[in-house]
From Swiss-Prot:
Main localization of the protein described in the UniProt heading: cytoplasm
Phosphoserine, modified sites: 159, 226
Protein name per its UniProtKB record: Serine/threonine-protein phosphatase 4 regulatory subunit 2
Signal peptide: none
Region (Disordered): 140-417
Pfam families: PPP4R2
Domain of life: Eukaryota
InterPro entries per UniProt: PPP4R2
Residue spans of biased composition, Basic and acidic residues class: 197-213, 231-258, 283-297, 318-327, 353-363
Organismal lineage: Eukaryota, Metazoa, Chordata, Craniata, Vertebrata
Compositional bias segments (type: Polar residues): 140-149, 158-170, 186-196, 259-269, 385-399
Compartments in which it is found: Cytoplasm, Cytoskeleton, Microtubule organizing center, Centrosome; Nucleus
Length: 417
C-alpha cells in the first residue's frame, strides 16, 4: 500500500465531523490482517481503529441478538454495554501497537468467521486486547515499504535494505552481534575461535596424510582379516555347494532314519504281538500247572491225613505195650538191685572170712588164697559195673520212650483240632 495515500485518508477522517467508514482505511485493516504489517504509527490510525471496533460490536449485536436460554453458570454474565465500555477503555489506553494487532484486524474485517454469538465475540476481542507487549511499525525500523510479514514472521522482499531479521518483539529486545558462521567440520583452536588460513592449510595437509595412513592401515587390516572372514567369492561358492551337499546328506539321513524308525516300529509291534501271545500261552501253562499243583497238594494232604490217622492209631496201640515194657524194666531194676545187694553182702562176708583167715594163719599161708580172693573181688566188681551200666542204659531208653510218647500225645490234640 501507498503510505502517503493512507496518511491523507486518515487526515480526511479526522477532519470530518461525521465519522464514516473509509474504504481506503478498511483496505489498510485487511492488509494488516493478512500480513501483520503496520506501515504507520499507532497514533495515526488509533482513532479509526477504535471507531471500526465500536461499529463492528454494534453491528454484531443488531444482527445476532442475545440468546434466549439462560446464561452459562460457569461464566460471569456481563451486559453488552459494560463489556463494550471495558474493551474501548483498554484500547484507548494503548500507547503503542499491540502485538495482537493482526488478530484484532481479522476480527474487525471478518467478525462472523469464528463467532456467532455476541457474548463469545466480545470475550474473544477482550482476550486479544488485554495484552501488554507492543510492536513497532515496519517502516520505522527499516525505512522501507517492501517488507512482507505473515503472522508476525518477516519475509524478504525486493528491497536490498532488508536485513536477516527484524525486531518484532518490541523495542526492548537487544539484537545479537553479527558473528561469522563457523562450520562444525572446520578445525577450532583451544579458545573456540577459528584458526588462521596458514594453520588451516597445515591442518588440511595433516588430515590428508592421516586419511592416507588410515586408509592404508585399514586396507592392511582388511587384507589380514579377509582370509579369516571374507574369503574369495569362488571359495564362497564352493562352501555354498558344500553346504547344499551337506543338507542333501542330512535330508537323506533323515529319510533313512524315518524308514528305520518305521521298520523298528513295525518290528516292535510284531514283537509286542508275539509277547502277548507268549504271555497268553504262559498264562495257560501257569493255569495248568496251578491245577496240577492243586491236585498234587490235595493228594499230599490226603496222604498226610491218612498217615496221621495211622500214626494216631499206632500210637494208641503202642501205649499199652510201652506200659508193659516199662513195668518189665521196673521189675528188672528191682531184681538187679536185689542181686547187687546180695553180691555186696557176699563180698563183705568174703572179706571178713579172708581177714579171719589171715589172722589165724598169721602169714603162714601161701599167696594162692590171697590171689584167689583178689580175683574174686575183681570179678564181683566187674559184675557190679556191668549190672549198673545195663541198668543205666535201660533207664535212658525208658526216659527217651517216655519223652517220645509225651510229644506224640501233645501232637494228637492239635491234629484232631
Amino acid at each position: 500500500m501507498d503510505v502517503e495515500r493512507l496518511q491523507e485518508a486518515l487526515k480526511d477522517f479526522e477532519k470530518r465531523g461525521k465519522k464514516e467508514v473509509c474504504p481506503v482505511l478498511d483496505q489498510f485493516l485487511c492488509h494488516v490482517a493478512k500480513t501483520g504489517e503496520t506501515m504507520i504509527q499507532w497514533s495515526q490510525f488509533k482513532g479509526y481503529f477504535i471507531f471500526k471496533l465500536e461499529k463492528v460490536m454494534d453491528d454484531f449485536r443488531t444482527s445476532a441478538p442475545e440468546p434466549r436460554g439462560p446464561p452459562n453458570p460457569n461464566v460471569e454474565y456481563i451486559p453488552f454495554d459494560e463489556m463494550k465500555e471495558r474493551i474501548l477503555k483498554i484500547v484507548t489506553g494503548f500507547n503503542g501497537i499491540p502485538f495482537t494487532i493482526q488478530r484484532l484486524c481479522e476480527l474487525l474485517t471478518d467478525p462472523r468467521r469464528n463467532y456467532t454469538g455476541t457474548d463469545k465475540f466480545l470475550r474473544g476481542v477482550e482476550k486479544n486486547v488485554m495484552v501488554v507487549s507492543c510492536v513497532y511499525p515496519s517502516s520505522e525500523k527499516n525505512n522501507s515499504n517492501s517488507l512482507n510479514r505473515m503472522n508476525g514472521v518477516m519475509f524478504p522482499g525486493n528491497s536490498p535494505s532488508y536485513t536477516e531479521r527484524s525486531n518484532i518483539n518490541g523495542p526492548g529486545t537487544p539484537r545479537p552481534l553479527n558473528r561469522p558462521k563457523v562450520s562444525l567440520s572446520a578445525p577450532m583452536t583451544t579458545n573456540g575461535l577459528p584458526e588462521s588460513t596458514d594453520s588451516k592449510e597445515a591442518n588440511l595437509q595433516q588430515n590428508e596424510e592421516k586419511n592416507h595412513s588410515d586408509s592404508s592401515t585399514s586396507e592392511s587390516e582388511v587384507s589380514s582379516v579377509s582370509p579369516l572372514k571374507n574369503k574369495h567369492p569362488d571359495e564362497d561358492a564352493v562352501e555354498a555347494e558344500g553346504h547344499e551337499v551337506k543338507r542333501l546328506r542330512f535330508d537323506k539321513e533323515g529319510e533313512v532314519r524315518e524308514t528305520a524308525s518305521q521298520t523298528t516300529s513295525s518290528e516292535i509291534s510284531s514283537v509286542m504281538v508275539g509277547e502277548t501271545e507268549a504271555s497268553s500261552s504262559s498264562q495257560d501253562k501257569d493255569k495248568d500247572s496251578r491245577c496240577t499243583r492243586q491236585h498234587c497238594t490235595e493228594e499230599d494232604e490226603e496222604e498226610d491225613e491218612e498217615e496221621e490217622e495211622e500214626s494216631f492209631m499206632t500210637s494208641r496201640e503202642m501205649i499199652p505195650e510201652r506200659k508193659n515194657q516199662e513195668k518189665e524194666s521196673d521189675d528188672a531194676l528191682t531184681v538187679n538191685e536185689e542181686t547187687s545187694e546180695e553180691n555186696n553182702q557176699m563180698e563183705e562176708s568174703d572179706v571178713s572170712q579172708a581177714e579171719k583167715d589171715l589172722l589165724h594163719s598169721e602169714g603162714s599161708e601161701n599167696e594162692g588164697p590171697v590171689s584167689s580172693s583178689s580175683s574174686d573181688c575183681r570179678e564181683t566188681e566187674e559184675l557190679v559195673g556191668s549190672n549198673s551200666s545195663k541198668t543205666g542204659e535201660i533207664l535212658s531208653e525208658s526216659s527217651m520212650e517216655n519223652d517220645d510218647e509225651a510229644t506224640e500225645v501233645t501232637d494228637e490234640p492239635m491234629e484232631q483240632d
